[in-house]
Amino acid sequence: MKEVVVDVAPKCIKGIEFGALSAKDIIAQSEVEVHTRDLYDLEKGRIPKDGGALDTKMGISSNANECATCHGNLASCHGHFGHIKLALPVFHVGYFKATIQVLQCICKNCSAVLLDEQTKRSFLNDLRRPHIDNLRRMKILKKLLEQCKKQRRCLNCNHVNGVVKKAASGAGPAALKIVHDTFRWIGKKATPEKDLWDKEFDEVFSRNPELEKFVKRIHDDLNPLKVLNLFKQISPSDCELLGIDSARGGRPEMYIWRYLPAPPVCIRPSVMMDAQSNEDDLTIKLTEIVWTSSLIKAGIEKGISINNLMEQWDYLQLSVAMYINSDSANPALLPSSGGGSKSSKPIRGFCQRLKGKQGRFRGNLSGKRVDFSGRTVISPDPNLKIDEVAVPDRVAKVLTYPEKCTRYNRKKLQKLILSGPNVHPGANYLLKQNESAKRNLRFGDRVKLAKNLHIGDVVERHIEDGDIVLFNRQPSLHRLSILSHYAKIRPWRTFRLNECVCTPYNADFDGDEMNIHVPQTEEARAEAINLMGVKNNLLTPKSGEPIIAATQDFITGSYLVSHKDSFFDRASLVQLLCMMSDADIQFDIPPPAIFKPVMLWTGKQVFSLLIKPNKKSNVVINLDAKNKTYTPPAKGFPNEMSPNDGFVIIRGSQILSGVMDKSTLGDGKKHSVFYTILRDYGPDEAANAMNRMAKLCARYLGNRGFSIGINDVIPGSDLKQKKELMVEQAYLKCDELIDLYNRGNLETQPGCNEEQTLEAKIGGLLSKVREEVGEICINELDSANAPLIMATCGSKGSTLNVSQMVAVVGQQIISGNRVPDGFQDRSLPHFTKNSKTPQSKGFVRNSFFSGLTPPEFLFHSISGREGLVDTAVKTAETGYMSRRLMKSLDDLSAQYDHTVRNSSNGIVQFTYGGDGLDPFDMEGDARPVNFVRQWDHAYNITFDIEDKGLLPYQIIELVDSILHPLEDRLVRYDNVGKIIPLEDSDKIEYIDQNDAEREFYQSIREFTTNKATKLAEIREKKMLKPFLTEPAEDFIRLDESDESLVAINQLSKVSANSINKFLEQCIYKYSRAKVEPGTAVGAIGAQSIGEPGTQMTLKTFHFAGVASMNVTLGVPRIKEIINASKVISTPIINSVLVNDDDEIAARVVKGRVEKTLLEDVAYFIEDVYKNNMAYLSIKIDLNTIEKLQLELNIESIAHSIANAPKLKILAGDVSVTGKDRINVLVTLREPKSINLMKNASADYKGTDASIVNSLFFRMQHLKRALPRICIKGLPDISRAVINIRDDGKKELLVEGYGLKEVMSTDGVVGTKTSTNHILEVFQVLGIEAARASIIGEIDYTMSKHGMSVDPRHIQLLGDVMTYKGEVLGITRFGLSKMRDSVLQLASFEKTTDHLFDASFYMKNDKIEGVSECIILGQTMNIGTGAFKLVNSFDVDKKALEMKPTLFEGMCEVSATA
């Protein structure tokens, strides 16, 4: 029976030590030696054979037998190990790499570590440091390995040591061989050992000259037997240097197989099928190993040829390797199991069972299947509250909750027991207090059981209305993909939810399925509803925007209700109010807007009642916001006079102007009605308003009727004509441009060639046509047109979709360009070759209503295909990216000391996000309070005609009197921890943890001072004293009756009450926004960056101001940044110029930076042969040099040629003739070529022919190489483009690497120059700059795609990548440098490598992080696990004092005696 997990168990795993079994351990734990290949004893009727791989001493795999060791059945016996004794030792494939490393560190003769005593001692001291962590230990061992590899001779026995490496493996038998190339270092130097070696071979060659050609490939073969003997000689202190802990029984020979453990039978069960059985891969491999081993043993006893023995040994080696890791051999080269054919599928070794998504780690430890869960299709139900979910009664009967019987609920539980399992509400099981087994209520006497129900018994009852359940939809991309709802049991077969809650789940009702989970303890229920409840998650932690809000039909309904021409008589009004309230709320109906001829109320009044139904409701909101389609009023008029009623003004919960559309009700807007209610009056009120809105809109829209049909998209004849005319005009303009292009007269744009310019211009023209036609189309359509209503209020689609249906579909774009040429020089065979016209390059002039022509249809489907492919590829890319982010950040949490630390207590940030505020509570622009809205709100709710208006200086004084005490509380400490007095604190440069709060108070002060200044200005305009400063005593007399004063009081009176209210709310909101200790800021940050990635487009380029300067954006860019890639697709250095107004100055700097090759400025290079010499003559084009503003003259070019690397031209051979000629003399003075000739023949006389030949080749070589010589600029930089910014200033965009060189170029402001290549920033400017660069780049990429992510999340990612002092990518390599936990790394990637590594170096995992705690089923120390609850006992202090021991007591007695 499953029991509830209890957190406070008496014993708790605090750490896991890894290690390997020695040969002794393997034999000690073994119950039987496996020595025969037979599995079954056929003579005794197919029972498992003794000593075979299925011996019953190792356990059983079916219920029919019983275990011969413990006599248990399948349920009670967990199995026992056996062992196989191998005839010869073999390498362990998991430790193969480590074995090679050990061999590289020791002498291959005497097994001593190849270091002198002093070095050994210093390394030992480093390794024995107390509290050294695994990361530092591994670094030390790596350094030691590097030093040992350099040592050529052993310092102990003076033996020569060469290179130890893995044999060049084809695959198969050679894969696990180690060779020792003894004389690799020696080369030609004579040493006695080498001479002896050569001598021996000479004797062999004299007998068999054929062998001579193999001499290069002769190595010393280190077979497992040799290695085993070497390892046995290693001393314990040397073991420690090799990273093996001999104090814990570690020895290097443990990592070579001599005895092989045979696992219990129950983990490799046989499948019986009528008189024959199917065996597990492991069993078959074990029998192969036993058989091969016995063959070798028999062969050694009989004395078989060495060739056969080695072959069998290799096969044994391979079998053992595949038993552990079946990837270790190439299946194509394996001897096949079934006679002639190749073995079909690779076997599943132990490693294959652990690794991968379905392996033990990810499939069964990090994530498991669970009980008490259900799954079915979802459908909408607007009559449910947003925090409810309708559960079908069939599901409710299966899912149960264990309720303990108390005196309060005994009667209820008795009723449920009587109902039984088939009637809802009922119960399925009963667990009596003193019994261990559950009673199934399907059977037995329920009446009797109900009577005997005692307090303390547990009844597993059906879930009922009001039970807390978790609701989830995959893919769970962020925290809000699983929320807690209250169950509502209903008939039918689907889960139902309010449509407002679709956004966080990203659910729609086209057949989506969702999962439900029922928490089984009171603690779990309390945590679920408080932390995951829908009401507590109306906002997204990504940016603090509302995510649960009105969608689709609700927005359309609200728009139609609140429209200017919506009027309702009393009957309709009352009906609407009942719809929104279930008829259980008292409504205070306001006076009607129209009295005669009949009383009518406006839709805005209905909506005002929705926000505040009656006087008892304390919701008073004040809001000013633009609608989605806001048309500004004529100049000088206030916003509310917008001609299309597009500006919402709400005062005291009364809607005065504007309509309700997506911007005021939808998600993602911080000036929406629900957000305002939530921030000022809490989530309950916001949820109530949302519930009323959902009920009202669904019913209203259903009664009114709202449909879309073909009639809605028929264009008028007028519209058709206008469209045709505009398209024709655009076609004519395009033809003119194409004509210019063909004649070569097209003026190019900066940084583009002619073709790019043509494409850019035509693209601009055609998109403009679509926009203009779209505008006309929208204006022509009737205001009651359904698609138009939806586009206007933002419930679905956009005006672009409407105009594509009605007027024109427009240009089809593929990867940011027009449709490319798919056939020879044309897009489709319907057009002529090299056609650039709009219709041949994907412009669709028809609308979807009029229908597309065949070529248009094809173009449209091409761009549709691109969208599909993009989506499919993107899903996989972003999914993997999110997983990596999550694994790297999952254990970061905010602590009680305000720092952000990881699970091993390493500090990542001193305060979260620099100010310790939670992104969830930000009101605007990542700030905790939206001052403007807060001021209006405070002003409106405290407004009293009797209040006296304050003078400007009084406002400033009042604010100071409230803020000063708060600021004085924030004391500063010096480095020793002493408090710094206030008067000295201004002189301090460094930041402390209270700086953010001081800044916040300062920003309040600035805002209020600004208000006071405005008031003073208004007073001055009305001819009154401004009073910005306090006047002298005798100037206090004021003329109260002044008309100006009355006017000012009406215009902008500021009362003491409203200032107090404003400050009180600002300070309250700031304190509420502080991040709570224990918050999993890392996990939330990872999701906040990963989740928007799924909405980004994949292949995105955008033009950084200049048409041809492409910058990678979207998912690939984010991937580059978080991988910390060394090579990125578009590295761009953005350099600010000293003289940024003058184009000539910019060109000069460009010439200094951009690589200029000789071929760019040379007319020609010709070869000249004369009788006595040959030279290359280069003519330089001085005009080009002048045009490009290059600082070059003929001498500097000659100098560059002479200094060109690799060409070896001597300076004396380069001469300048005239103004524009350079001659390069071609000689054979180059020392190398002469030496070659001398060596070629001993009697070198220097024949003429050979000299002429080599001269000719050198000439041709130089002729080819000279044009590519860089004569100016930085060799790594191929392009630089002058970009004109929006403010008219010029900057240089440089493509390529070389930040340091560009920064130090004359004419560039080095301090303002930056690059988008993170690693280069790190190398040039250091780690802080790299952190700032990571944050800036991710923020830039997100903002380009319109994603709002709070900067705190991005800062945290930047800090995680840099807090170790180097830039670590969010990959398995970066993660292994950040975290030391074996289980965390194993549950990420390369599972088995980490496990073998851990056991070789005997690592210790302390079980601190999230991944490890999940694997071991423990409470993690973040979130609600960040603290422990302690009970206080009333214990006398004396009782806790230490009592003297018996011995001490006797001493005291004797002393007194």
From Swiss-Prot:
What Enzyme Commission number does this protein have? 2.7.7.6
Q: Which Gene3D superfamilies match?
A: 1.10.132.30, 1.10.150.390, 2.40.40.20, 6.10.250.2940, 6.20.50.80, RNA polymerase ii, RNA polymerase II, clamp domain, RNA polymerase Rpb1, domain 3
Q: Where is this region: Bridging helix?
A: 854-866
SMART domains in the record: RPOLA_N (SM00663)
Q: Where in the cell is it found?
A: Nucleus
| GO annotation (BP), single | termination of RNA polymerase III transcription
Protein family: Belongs to the RNA polymerase beta' chain family.
Function per UniProt = DNA-dependent RNA polymerase catalyzes the transcription of DNA into RNA using the four ribonucleoside triphosphates as substrates. Largest and catalytic core component of RNA polymerase III which synthesizes small RNAs, such as 5S rRNA and tRNAs. Forms the polymerase active center together with the second largest subunit. A single-stranded DNA template strand of the promoter is positioned within the central active site cleft of Pol III.
Tell me what this protein is called: DNA-directed RNA polymerase III subunit RPC1
Q: Which organism is it from?
A: Debaryomyces hansenii (strain ATCC 36239 / CBS 767 / BCRC 21394 / JCM 1990 / NBRC 0083 / IGC 2968)
Source lineage: Eukaryota, Fungi, Dikarya, Ascomycota, Saccharomycotina
